[in-house]
Amino acid sequence: MKLRRERFERRNGSGKNSQSSSSWMVTFTDLITLILVFFILLFSMSQIDLQKFKAAVDSIQKEGNGLQPDQTSIEKKNTSPSDTKKQEDQQDQLLKKVNTYIKDNHLKAQMTAKRDERGVVLVLQEAVLFDTGEAKVLKNAETLLHQIAVLLQTIPNDIQVEGHTDSRNISTYRYPSNWELSAARASGVIQYFTSKEKLPSKRFIAVGYADTKPVKDNKTNEHMKENRRVEIVIKKSKTTSS
């Protein structure tokens, strides 16, 4: 009778082996549950940190303008009324000097001078310096550029040379657009000053504006002619020569 009972228990999975198997399954299930809870907690914590990080970034972005004022604002704050008046007087004297030089050297037909927020500006029309659609300085223009170089040698300020075009599109192998043409013209003028006249290259910067800064609308040939120009900007400086 006892033997039959043992056989029955073995067939039906009862006994110690069955109990051990069930206990193992319970332990494994508990372990999986704990791991799942652990990762849920980690995910929740990471979400909280991410929200805090986003909030901090938003706060910095809102205050960004106050943390990084532009250079112009700094200069304005650091410039006293007396310094501003002095700089204005220096610019007036420089413009007067330039106009006197232009008159004495009979250059009025080839260039003009003006003053704006950049400094004192020498304006040269395209026909004086280049062939249409080209950036190589004309041989005939070298006399004019030499006279300008003589003037610049007496002025310690930095110089910005700007190329400008009219609104007509250009598309050549050398100059795919007005941007390349205007920049090449500015660079060509600087190349003459630094290579032929031996002016320090560190004083110069070349800028090409294409047709983005016209002085007239481009509705007539005469207006387009005025827009095709090179501007030599004698930049403002505390050491402006009188």
Curated annotation (Swiss-Prot):
GO terms for biological process: bacterial-type flagellum-dependent cell motility. Residues 117-238 form the OmpA-like domain. Residues 1-21, 64-91 are annotated as: Disordered. It comes from the Bacteria. It is found in: Cell membrane. Pfam families: MotB_plug (PF13677), OmpA (PF00691). Residues 1-23 are cytoplasmic. Residues 1-12, 73-89 have a biased composition (Basic and acidic residues). It is a single-pass type II membrane protein. This is Uncharacterized protein YtxE. It comes from Bacillus subtilis (strain 168).
